[in-house]
């Protein structure tokens, strides 16, 4: 127990260290910022030598891998140009390899000043959505709210959508569709060959983590001061969680865990 708490404490404290290098990396715009969605259709690597300014909803298509190097920083604008939040959506059959390290975590955050984030830390961009082929309680497929034409669910419990390790997701939860605020990390029908380890969601407007069905396992994950639940499961999620930590605020928060087994009627 002491070892686990020490591990979580070290990771969480490291996540809130101000990294001065954020300001000095080359800035690379991702998306046009005019409301046009960006499809990634070839294998792509985001380098730690750049800071990526996310200004569109970005879709990683089937058969394509988005690799993000350790230490990379992605800053998302408040809008995609059409009053919806920028976000990264990994489609079924797509892969994200965001394999950071303890000393070089990968950071998704808001492209805002410290003053703005201090005044209102939640809901400044969308979040990360991963769609897989793992089973749902009701069978078949479904769709994440606000994401049209991108299904999740299937029959492959051992499906892999890639790796998220030593990843930080901050200040998200803005709407990606009409009245559809999203979670910091949405795992929709994601299979148990996907690695989710040492992932932190902080100051998200909606849930920290939400699993819609699927079998993905979570280890060393933290949800800090989110506006709704720390961890939320729906549609017959059957994965496992180990070393999960939630810290909730006193003014805006939901539950540490909310778990539903079937589709909502």
Where are each of the predicted segments found?
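Short intrinsically disordered, low-complexity coil segments enriched in acidic
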Residues: 1-2, 19
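Bacterial N-terminal signal peptides that target proteins for export
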Residues: 2-12
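Bacterial N-terminal signal peptides
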Residues: 10-21
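Beta-strand/loop edge motif enriched in small/polar residues
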Residues: 24-265
């Amino acid at each position: 127990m002491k070892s686990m708490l020490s591990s979580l404490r070290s990771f969480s404290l490291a996540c809130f260290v101000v990294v001065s290098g954020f300001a000095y990396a080359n800035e690379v715009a991702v998306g046009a910022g005019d409301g046009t969605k960006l499809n990634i259709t070839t294998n792509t690597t985001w380098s730690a030598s750049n800071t990526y300014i996310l200004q569109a909803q970005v879709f990683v298509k089937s058969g394509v891998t988005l690799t993000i190097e350790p230490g990379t920083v992605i800053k998302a604008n408040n809008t995609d140009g059409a009053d919806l939040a920028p976000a990264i959506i990994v489609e079924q059959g797509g892969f994200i390899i965001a394999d950071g390290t303890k000393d070089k975590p990968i950071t998704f955050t808001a492209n805002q000043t410290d003053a703005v984030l201090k005044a209102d830390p939640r809901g400044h961009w969308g979040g990360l959505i991963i769609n897989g082929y793992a089973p749902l309680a009701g069978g078949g497929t479904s769709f994440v709210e606000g994401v049209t034409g991108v299904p999740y669910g299937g029959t492959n419990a051992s499906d892999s959508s890639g790796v998220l390790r030593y990843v930080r997701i901050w200040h998200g939860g803005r709407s990606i569709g009409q009245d559809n605020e999203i979670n910091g990390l949405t795992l929709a029908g994601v299979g148990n060959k996907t690695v989710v380890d040492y992932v932190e969601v902080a100051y998200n407007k909606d849930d920290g983590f939400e699993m819609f069905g699927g079998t993905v396992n979570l280890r060393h994950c933290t949800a800090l001061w989110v506006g709704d639940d720390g961890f939320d499961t729906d549609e017959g999620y059957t994965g496992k969680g180990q070393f999960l930590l939630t810290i909730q605020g006193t003014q805006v928060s939901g539950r540490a865990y909310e778990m539903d087994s079937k589709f909502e009627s």
